[in-house]
From Swiss-Prot:
This is 34 kDa cell wall protein. One of its GO terms (cellular component) is extracellular region. It comes from Arabidopsis thaliana. Its main location: secreted. It is found in: Secreted, Cell wall. Keywords: Cell wall, Secreted.
Length: 5
């Protein structure tokens, strides 16, 4: 799982 900020 990846999160972008």
């Amino acid at each position: 799982e990846q999160d972008r900020r």
